[in-house]
Amino acid sequence: MPSFLTWLGGAAALISVAGCGQAIIGSFLLSRFRWQERRPPCPDASNLPAVTILKPLHGDEPLLSEALESVCRQDYPHLQIVFGVQSTEDTAISHVRALQARYPTRDITLVIDPQQHGINRKVGNLINMYAFARHDVLVISDSDIHAGPHYLRDIVRTLESPQVGLVTTLYAGLPASKTLVREMGAIQINHNFLPGVMMSRLLGRRDCLGATMALRREILEQIGGLEALVDHVADDAVLGHAVRALDLDIALAPCLTWTTIGESSMRELLLHELRWGRTVKNLEPVGYGMSAIQLPLFWATLTLLCCHDARWAWVFFGTVWLIRAMTAIGVNIATAVPAWAMLPLLPLREWISAAIMVGSARGKEVAWRGQTLHIERHVPVTNLRQPLEPGD
């Protein structure tokens, strides 16, 4: 009669097989997404609506100048760029001043305002910046996001549909340098998160990915403005929830962006991932638990530990590793972020991810830029600062 360990190893193997299937499908969907990322004939510039892009800043960070400059290099004619900080001593100011000098013809505004509006300082910063936004199409973009020159055109084209209330973009991890810690951080995003997002969209989920959030001013005002988000840690999730309550869709722009992976120590990386894990777990506990399927090498290793005397377990582990490596190569090509040296470390990366999931199971507090914040579940739309009614 099979022992408990044999049963456990068999169950882990089944989950690992499902994880391999998810990795293959997710990698294929991502590659297809990039292949379809074509440049249509550029429309007449006079037909493009004016856009205000809001970039909240907080201190210096690796590749900050490069990320901010990618906004200044947009192939978009009617563009206002608003940067915001909350202290005159903020080290990000020097980067903005340099861009203003380098791009004198660009409409670049720097807002320095210490006023706080709630627990979410990023949204508080955005509230201060919003007062200077002149245009009706608004794009909120994180400070560490690198974008191609057609980023705004792709977003605006997607937002043109009357059924679309919010546009977001995929993002890949871009290591600020070739260090083990930063490569590990990029693997988590590129090989686990990205294929998982593609798979979830195939199954019908329409989440707001907070690195880019674009919407029309009228929609923002209907949901209660930025003030409706300022008392929530997961402002992107709350915004997406509110837009869907208006019976509007969350669309994905046909472009990929890149987020800087700038952690300098393993402790810093683990705390970052733990913060992200706890946030997602508290917002979507079932979905977060199901995401464990994205770790086929973890489950294959568990199979090997339970059935180490069985030859099939070793063959199975090697096969899963090979499949995982092949899908990782496909993702590397699709994201244009080479990480070939990390392929032998994929099992270690997945065990770290599993440990993060276990650590995320308890606790509703996260550390973020010097703050300790409490994460809440999705609030009902009626609890936002202004009630929402579909069709308003």
Segment roles from a protein language model:
Residues 98-131, 135, 154-223, 227, ...:
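Long helical/loop segments within the catalytic core of UDP-sugar-dependent glycosyltransferases
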Residues 1-69:
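N-proximal low-complexity "stem/linker" segments adjacent to membrane-targeting elements
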Residues 68-117:
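Acidic donor-binding segment of Leloir-type glycosyltransferases
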Residues 49-52, 80, 238:
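Cell-envelope/extracellular polymer assembly enzymes that use nucleotide-activated donors
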Residues 232-238, 253:
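Acidic donor-binding loop at a coil-to-helix junction in glycosyltransferase catalytic cores
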Residues 91, 141-158:
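Acidic donor-binding/catalytic loop of UDP-sugar-dependent glycosyltransferases
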Residues 126, 135-146:
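Short beta-strand-to-loop acidic/aromatic patch adjacent to the donor-nucleotide binding site
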Residues 4-7, 14-17, 28-32, 290-367:
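Membrane-embedded multi-pass helical conduit in multi-pass membrane proteins
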